[in-house]
Structures are given as C-alpha cells and as structure tokens.
C-alpha cells in the first residue's frame, strides 16, 4: 500500500510531522533533481553584491521552509487521497528548492534565517487550518500562495545582481515550479479564497520576507 493511501493514526501522523519539521530545520535537504546552477561559471561578486544576493537567497530559503510546513500541514488534514498525493509531490519539489537555496547560501558565505523555527511552526499551523477548511479551499490556498510566491521571485530576479548567475538560475527554475504548482492546484478543484484572506496572506509574506532578508 502506498504512503499516499495508507491510513495513519494520530500518533503516527504526529511522529511523521515532527520528523519532517526536524529534517527541514536541522537536516541537510537532499534534492532529487540536479541543481540548475551546477556547472555555471560564476563571475566574482563585490562585497555589496554578495551581501545583496545572500539576503535574497536567505528569503527564498525561508520561503521554502514555509512551503514545507504549509504542505505538511495540508497533507495531514487532506480528505481526498488524490489531493494529499498532489501536496506530497509538490512538497518533494519544494525540497529541491530548499536544497538549492541552502547550497547557494553556503557558497556565498551566508547563513539561513535564525527565525526558521518560527516560520515553520507558524506556517504549519496555517497549513492545518487550510486543510481543515476542506480540500477545495486548501487547494485554493495553494493556488494563491504560489501566485504570491511567483510575484516575489519575479521581484527578486529584478534585484539580484545581474552577474550572480547561479542565484538567478536557481530562482528562475523555482519560479517555473511555483507556477506549475498553482496550475496543478487549480486543475484539481481549487476554490478561490476570500479577498480578506488573500490580503492577510500577503501581509504574512511581507513580514517574513522583510525579516528573513536581515535575520
């Protein structure tokens, strides 16, 4: 029986979610796909350029921490096995993003956000609430989240130094994946979220991106 269709007890689910949190926050993520920046010849960056790139890649890494938490929260409460499978697949692809961002941060000499445990906990609870609202709204939450993430990534591509080829290549690949995740959610029956919920999501994202850039 596949993991997607297997029934877990509440204790099993809690153990699985705890393991996922620890792996995300303290483990070294392993990508299933090759880093798109691998093999690129990277020109030298000035100190100012490197500092700027570190800030944006730290934000992107924290965004992927949030994505892991959101998807795991939604997986834990999904009613339809097909919806749970969709979340599981998306979470695996987001793990690739997490690994790529972490690898690039290390190359740049930067650190991940010191607030990642807070981001994860907060996002996991949001994912649980989204899932408990029913699969259509949970899928709508994914669609809206990915729309907002794609906008953030497009903004980063305008601001990351033009000669930071590796960071830009990673962000470009991430952007395409996020667009596809949103389309997948829509085609699976996503229900549009209320306007106020969208605004609250944007505010939450603004707080995270602002703080993670520096801390």
UniProtKB/Swiss-Prot annotation:
One of its GO terms (cellular component) is plasma membrane. It comes from the Bacteria. Its cofactor is Fe cation. Gene3D superfamilies: 1.20.1260.10. It is found in: Cell membrane. Keywords: Cell membrane, Iron, Membrane, Metal-binding, Monooxygenase, Oxidoreductase, Ubiquinone biosynthesis. GO terms for molecular function: 3-demethoxyubiquinol 3-hydroxylase activity; metal ion binding. It catalyses: a 5-methoxy-2-methyl-3-(all-trans-polyprenyl)benzene-1,4-diol + AH2 + O2 = a 3-demethylubiquinol + A + H2O. Fe cation 1 binds at residues 64, 94, 97, 178. It is a peripheral membrane protein. Fe cation 2 binds at residues 94, 146, 178, 181. The keyword Iron applies. Binds 2 iron ions per subunit. GO terms for biological process: ubiquinone biosynthetic process. Coiled coil: none annotated. Pathway: Cofactor biosynthesis; ubiquinone biosynthesis. Its EC number is 1.14.99.60. The keyword Oxidoreductase applies. It holds the Pfam family COQ7. Its main location: membrane. Catalyzes the hydroxylation of 2-nonaprenyl-3-methyl-6-methoxy-1,4-benzoquinol during ubiquinone biosynthesis. Belongs to the COQ7 family. This is 3-demethoxyubiquinol 3-hydroxylase. It comes from Coxiella burnetii (strain CbuG_Q212) (Coxiella burnetii (strain Q212)).
